[in-house]
From Swiss-Prot:
Belongs to the MOZART1 family. Keywords: Cytoplasm, Cytoskeleton. This is Mitotic-spindle organizing protein 1. Required for gamma-tubulin complex recruitment to the microtubule organizing center (MTOC). PANTHER family: MITOTIC-SPINDLE ORGANIZING PROTEIN 1. It is found in: Cytoplasm, Cytoskeleton, Microtubule organizing center, Spindle pole body. It comes from Aspergillus clavatus (strain ATCC 1007 / CBS 513.65 / DSM 816 / NCTC 3887 / NRRL 1 / QM 1276 / 107). GO terms for biological process: gamma-tubulin complex localization; microtubule nucleation by interphase microtubule organizing center; mitotic spindle assembly. Part of the gamma-tubulin complex. GO terms for cellular component: cytoplasm; gamma-tubulin ring complex; interphase microtubule organizing center; mitotic spindle pole body; spindle.
Length: 71
């Protein structure tokens, strides 16, 4: 089906462009993560809420910068 292949190619191009923008903005999102975000937004998820969740998850998984001082 040429039409289905055209749609897949267009989707790949969109993700490639979004990945380039994401890289310029230092979002640290890979193509898979961007694709999932696009899918969630297309299905009605609020983009601001999604951004807040991603930021919260990054805070939770970020290594702590606290240093234990010897006593």
């Amino acid at each position: 089906m040429p039409q289905a292949e055209d749609k897949r190619q267009a989707a790949r191009e969109v993700i490639d462009i979004l990945h380039e923008i994401s890289t310029l903005l230092n979002t640290n999102l890979d193509r898979t993560e961007l694709s999932l975000c696009v899918s969630l937004i297309e299905n009605g998820v609020n983009p601001d809420a999604l951004a807040a969740v991603i930021a919260d998850l990054r805070k939770e998984t970020a290594p702590t910068s606290r240093h234990v001082l010897p006593e």
